[in-house]
């Protein structure tokens, strides 16, 4: 089979996965890594070259969508790193938050989601649908990712048949846009430091926003996917039998320790 990982980071998941497939006796025909960063691709190659399990697999690097294929697609913390829009509730309606310059510094600037924004169909359409039956207080700030429709459509064009697994930070829409979550979820990460000011060290920080999983399901459905559902990572791991695997690993470790003590007695 084939596995396509989108945004593979340093290659850690790829190396571990190939090791597990080898232990199970089901090696992959091809492991494709889609990453546009030359620096990250070099790190991934270095990591996989040091992995014995990767030696028998055709590891391929891509900087764009592959040719149509059948297999599994995996992405970890991918959707939350996509470009996002930010909005502010004012007088009971959402205003678009953009960026302005004030006294030589970058600042947030709010403007109505009509008039100049009237042609921005993605912004207006999403908020009209998402907030149709959700009441948010003035001053509330939130984020959403407008690119999900295009992304799933592109993925659907190359995936003939298979499964897509996406692990990300996020919540279903009603929980994400909760009236008490007034400052949104925009976060910035730089050298193991986290903060919420994207204007601090611009261009150096990784900017993320939590994912509206309801929007993910809607976009996937529009692109022709059948959505199996979404769950927490804890429930996913427990459902996959991680407790039994942990117990088996502990039993193996105990047997090994016992054999070692007998041998040295």
Model-derived features with residue positions:
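Conserved class I S-adenosyl-L-methionine
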Residues: 1-9
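Conserved SAM-binding loop of SAM-dependent methyltransferases across substrates and taxa
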Residues: 10-26
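Conserved SAM-binding motif I beta-strand of class I
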Residues: 27-35
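Conserved SAM/SAH-binding beta-strand->alpha-helix loop
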Residues: 37-39
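Conserved SAM-binding loop
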Residues: 44-45
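Conserved SAM-binding strand-loop segment of SAM-dependent methyltransferases
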Residues: 50-64
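A mobile, often basic/glycine-rich helix-loop segment
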Residues: 74-128, 179-190
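Long, Lys/Arg- and hydrophobic-enriched amphipathic alpha-helices
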Residues: 126-265
